[in-house]
């Protein structure tokens, strides 16, 4: 099975206007990603405020994505839930709508055992024949995959990748040593993208590429083309932006940054709130200093 989980994947924000999906802004955001040739987009993940979407909004967002992208790049949906039956419902809807794969984290809040995590993903795998990427974000979910659980899950035919949002630089090497060769590991942490690539990672699921897809794509292309020094120089230049986009809980800062650049309204759903004045000031300063434009 072809592995779609690789390269630069943008974890897209979800724009709102008057507390409804702003599909006009969403089309503009998607077209920017297509223009700058990112390798795939992730819809309705953490950055996309998936927890705040109704099931109908979720399906509409995916349907709109499929129509706009029109097979020009893979679309990955977020199917995380602490209710296994609902996660399956999200996955089945994703398949029916026409996305290319989905990502899911271990169930949050309920703190399942490793066996429970395995059974959750086994149920997802049996219910839907889309390719699956595991999502490791323990600061959000409260639990994480053990290396042994990743190994067990990687033996299921359609579980093809792991998104690792941590900073344990040994982990990619440990996982690479035990899983099948075509199982991909991607980083979901912008600040350590090159450090993780040096440890065997072959993809970047980025928040920053919402507002700087061209720069992020160039950075990763330099790395893949063995221009290590060029990639390091770009990465160093972007470090202040990475940090600014995590001054407060994601996606609060990136939603404001997108608004500042004219991509969407600065509207975010509770329990998240708008960026503080201090964060806004820092974000504007860094965007200006880097001459980022859409």
From Swiss-Prot:
Protein name: 4-hydroxy-tetrahydrodipicolinate synthase
Example of a GO cellular component annotation carried by this entry: cytoplasm
Substrates-to-products reaction catalysed: L-aspartate 4-semialdehyde + pyruvate = (2S,4S)-4-hydroxy-2,3,4,5-tetrahydrodipicolinate + H2O + H(+)
EC number per UniProt: 4.3.3.7
SMART domains cross-referenced by the UniProt entry: DHDPS
InterPro entries assigned to the protein according to its UniProt record, in alphabetical order: Aldolase_TIM, DapA, DapA-like, Schiff_base-form_aldolases_AS, Schiff_base-form_aldolases_CS
Active site: 135, 163
Source superkingdom: Bacteria
Entry-linked HAMAP family: DapA
Pathway listed: Amino-acid biosynthesis; L-lysine biosynthesis via DAP pathway; (S)-tetrahydrodipicolinate from L-aspartate: step 3/4
UniProt cross-references to CDD domains, sorted A to Z: DHDPS (cd00950)
Pfam family, one: DHDPS
Family: Belongs to the DapA family.
UniProt site (Part of a proton relay during catalysis): 46, 109
Subunit annotation: Homotetramer; dimer of dimers.
Gene assigned in the entry: dapA
Major localization listed first in the record, in broad terms: cytoplasm
One record GO biological process: glyoxylate catabolic process
UniProt source species: Rickettsia typhi (strain ATCC VR-144 / Wilmington)
EC class name: lyase
Compartments where located: Cytoplasm
């Amino acid at each position: 099975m072809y592995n779609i989980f690789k390269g630069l994947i943008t974890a897209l924000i979800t724009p709102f206007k008057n507390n409804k999906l702003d599909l006009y802004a969403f089309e503009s955001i998607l077209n920017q990603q297509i223009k700058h040739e990112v390798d795939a987009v992730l819809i309705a993940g953490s950055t996309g405020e998936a927890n705040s979407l109704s099931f109908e909004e979720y399906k509409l967002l995916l349907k709109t994505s499929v129509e706009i992208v029109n097979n020009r790049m893979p679309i990955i949906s977020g199917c995380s839930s602490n209710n296994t039956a609902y996660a399956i419902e999200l996955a089945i809807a994703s398949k029916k709508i026409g996305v290319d794969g989905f990502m899911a984290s271990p169930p949050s809040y309920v703190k399942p055992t490793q066996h429970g995590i395995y059974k959750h993903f086994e149920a997802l795998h049996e219910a839907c024949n889309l390719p699956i990427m595991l999502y490791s974000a323990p600061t959000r979910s409260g639990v994480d995959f053990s290396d042994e659980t990743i190994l067990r899950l990687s033996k299921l035919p359609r579980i093809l990748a792991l998104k690792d949002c941590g900073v344990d630089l040994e982990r990619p090497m440990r996982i690479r040593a035990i899983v099948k060769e075509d199982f991909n590991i991607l980083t979901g942490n912008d600040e350590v993208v090159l450090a993780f690539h040096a440890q065997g990672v072959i993809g970047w699921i980025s928040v920053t590429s919402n507002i700087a897809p061209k720069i992020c794509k160039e950075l990763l292309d330099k790395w893949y083309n063995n221009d290590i020094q060029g990639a390091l120089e770009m990465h160093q230049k972007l470090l202040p932006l990475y940090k600014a986009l995590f001054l407060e809980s994601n996606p609060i800062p990136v939603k404001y940054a997108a608004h500042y650049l004219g991509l969407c309204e600065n509207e975010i759903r509770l329990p998240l709130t708008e960026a503080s004045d201090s964060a806004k000031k820092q974000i504007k300063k860094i965007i200006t200093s880097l001459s980022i434009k859409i």
